Design a protein with these regions (language model features):
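C-terminal subregions of glycosyltransferases and related glycan-biosynthesis enzymes
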Residues: 102, 157-251
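Nucleotide-sugar donor-binding/catalytic module of glycosyltransferases
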Residues: 1-169
Length: 251
C-alpha cells in the first residue's frame, strides 16, 4: 500500500456531483486536481497546470483560483486521436466572466486544478448544482480568478455516454435540435442553479455581482421579450452564433 493514497467509501450512492465534492472537501493539500478513472494524463500535466496556478495566485493572493486546460479526445475503441476538446466543441474559453458562466460551462472537470482557498465556499452544496466543475468555476469567477491553459494536458477518452467530442459538431447540434423539450428543461435547470448560487452566496457578493445574479435567477419570470433583453443586456450568452441562435429560440 502507498501511504499517500487514501480511500473513502460512501455508505450510499451520492451521485457523481456529491462524490466529487465530498472528495474535494476532504483534501488537505495546497492544490486539488480532479480526474476521471479512464483518462490518461500527460507526463507534464501537473507541472504545466501548477505553473499557471502559481502565476495566477501571485495576481490573486489568498483568493480561490481555478485553472482548466484543453484535452485531446481519443476514441476508446480504436485509440485514434479525434482532436482537441475545446476546438471540437466550439466553446469560447476566453469568456469566463460571471455572466457567461451563468449560462454556459467552459471547464472540463478532469483538467481542473484549484487551490485550497476554494474550500470555505463549499460548506453548502445545494441540490440544484448541475455539474460540479460548473459550480466551482462560478465560485472562482465571483470571488477569485479563472485561468485557461490552451495545452491539451490529457487524453480524454471518448465513449458513447459523452455528449460532445467523438461526434462532429454538426451531429451534436442535430441531436440538440431533435430534443427541444429536453433543452428547455436544461435551460430551466440552469436558471435554478443560478438562483441557488445567489441564495448561497448573496451576502458575499458585491452590489454589481448581486444585481447580475438576480437578473439571471429571475429570467424565467420575465416576459418573452424581457428574457431576450436580459440575455443581451447582461451577457447571459453561450459560445458562437449557432448556440446563441438556439438559446434565443428557447428563451
Amino acid at each position: 500500500k502507498d501511504s499517500r493514497v487514501r480511500l473513502f467509501e460512501n455508505k450510499t450512492n451520492q451521485g457523481y456531483i456529491r462524490n466529487f465534492m465530498s472528495g474535494i472537501v476532504r483534501c488537505d493539500s495546497p492544490y486539488i486536481m480532479l480526474c476521471d478513472q479512464d483518462d490518461i494524463w500527460n507526463w507534464d500535466k501537473v507541472e504545466l497546470t501548477l505553473e499557471k496556478m502559481k502565476l495566477m495566485e501571485r495576481e490573486n493572493p489568498e483568493k480561490p483560483v481555478l485553472v482548466f486546460t484543453d484535452a485531446m479526445n481519443f476514441d476508446s475503441s480504436t485509440g485514434k486521436k479525434l482532436g482537441r476538446f475545446h476546438e471540437m466543441s466550439h466553446l469560447n474559453v476566453k469568456k469566463v466572466d460571471t455572466a457567461h458562466l451563468f449560462m454556459e460551462n467552459k471547464c472540463i472537470g478532469c483538467t481542473i486544478m484549484m487551490n485550497r482557498a476554494i474550500l470555505p465556499y463549499l460548506r453548502e452544496l445545494p441540490e440544484e448544482i448541475r455539474v460540479h466543475d460548473w459550480w466551482l468555476a462560478l465560485i472562482c469567477s465571483h470571488f477569485g480568478a479563472i485561468g485557461y491553459l490552451p495545452e491539451a494536458t490529457l487524453m480524454y477518452r471518448q465513449h458513447e455516454g459523452n455528449q460532445i467530442g467523438g461526434t462532429s459538431y454538426s451531429g451534436y447540434l442535430r441531436k440538440r435540435i431533435s430534443k427541444m423539450k429536453e433543452q428547455r428543461q436544461v435551460l430551466f435547470d440552469t436558471y435554478r442553479q443560478g438562483k441557488a448560487f445567489l441564495r448561497v452566496f448573496d451576502s458575499q457578493m458585491t452590489k454589481e455581482q448581486r444585481k447580475t445574479a438576480t437578473k439571471f435567477a429571475t429570467m424565467a419570470d420575465a416576459s418573452f421579450f424581457g428574457r431576450r433583453y436580459l440575455a443581451l443586456r447582461y451577457g447571459f450568452l453561450k459560445s458562437g452564433l449557432i448556440r446563441n441562435a438556439g438559446l434565443f429560440f428557447l428563451l
